């Protein structure tokens, strides 16, 4: 996982996840804009295989935010979440009569960007 920090944005990137980008987008669309704690609850309860790598990525981004920037995890939210297609892994499966059948395993790159929520000043 590649982690970048720019301003108050904390970015975490996971590359070459053995998963279809279409299937990963199904989960990423559910967590975009949610708070950190709400995102972890959603990912724990969803029954999809892609939830585990996304969970690890969100957890890593939050750990980087607290360790490197000193930000509170409870105040952060998912500002941007993207899935891009990666390289296609190509293999051949042997078939009857000496033939072979191509197998294409899709991979994807997942990017999570955390931001800290702005606290509005109290008006007395």
Swiss-Prot record:
UniProt keyword list: Chloroplast, Plastid, Ribonucleoprotein, Ribosomal protein, RNA-binding, rRNA-binding
Checking InterPro entries in the record gives: Ribosomal_uL22, Ribosomal_uL22_bac/chlpt-type, Ribosomal_uL22_bac/org-type, Ribosomal_uL22_sf
Any one of the GO BP annotations: translation
Q: Which CDD domains match?
A: Ribosomal_L22
Highest taxon of the source?
Eukaryota
On whether Ribosomal protein is a keyword of this UniProt record, the answer is yes
Q: List the Gene Ontology MF annotations in alphabetical order.
A: rRNA binding; structural constituent of ribosome
Principal localisation: plastid
As for subcellular location, the record says:
Plastid, Chloroplast
Under the cellular component aspect of Gene Ontology, which terms does the record hold? chloroplast; large ribosomal subunit
- Pfam families according to UniProt: Ribosomal_L22
Role, per record: This protein binds specifically to 23S rRNA.
Query: Assembly and partners?
Result: Part of the 50S ribosomal subunit.
- Entry's family note: Belongs to the universal ribosomal protein uL22 family.
Name of this chain's protein: Large ribosomal subunit protein uL22c
Q: Which organism is it from?
A: Amborella trichopoda
Protein's gene: rpl22
